[in-house]
């Protein structure tokens, strides 16, 4: 079976950590390659960086895209103060490359947005400020690449978080890492996820099977679906 539950993804991440495998640089590279395959160098890219590791992924992508000649702006509404260790290193690399961050969206729409606000771990409704930011991004009607899951969408249910439901990022593409939660394949999630892609981050089927154990082994099916 495929890696299709959030807890399976977490199990893979834990094994990678124990083995000393840094997945964030791989995720950021996969995102940067995805954008570069669809947008010419010199175009304006807006990277939305949240307060967790999803934000770290997008910061790695931002640094790589800037090095490739893209005009990259980073918006980090919560700032860098509480970033986890790996994401903090990604932030430091972005700053070392001359990058800066703003708390607010720019006045004009970019050519493409990378959504790295919240990942598969988000289980609470979006607050008012986050919702306002997402509404503005959606109103731009520009291509959006969501990393892991569109921010504001539950990876467990495939439905918008909140009661009443909020309004997630409406992605053109969703690039999942390691596995695609089954809920994101449900018909109701498609309107938010757009086209769905999977990157295994260079992890082998044997590694995935070891991580999730005999109750949820990943097979070569996942490998055949990998890559942006």
UniProtKB/Swiss-Prot annotation:
Primary enzyme class: isomerase
Binding site for (6S)-NADPHX: 53-57, 119-125, 148
Keywords on record: Isomerase, Metal-binding, NAD, NADP, Nucleotide-binding, Potassium
Cross-referenced InterPro entries: YjeF_N_dom, YjeF_N_dom_sf
Cofactors named for this entry: K(+)
Pfam family, any one: YjeF_N
Domain YjeF N-terminal residues, every copy: 9-209
Catalytic activity reported: (6R)-NADHX = (6S)-NADHX; (6R)-NADPHX = (6S)-NADPHX
Catalytic activity, EC: 5.1.99.6
HAMAP family xrefs: NADHX_epimerase
Family membership: Belongs to the NnrE/AIBP family.
Protein purpose: Catalyzes the epimerization of the S- and R-forms of NAD(P)HX, a damaged form of NAD(P)H that is a result of enzymatic or heat-dependent hydration. This is a prerequisite for the S-specific NAD(P)H-hydrate dehydratase to allow the repair of both epimers of NAD(P)HX.
Protein name: NAD(P)H-hydrate epimerase
Gene: nnrE
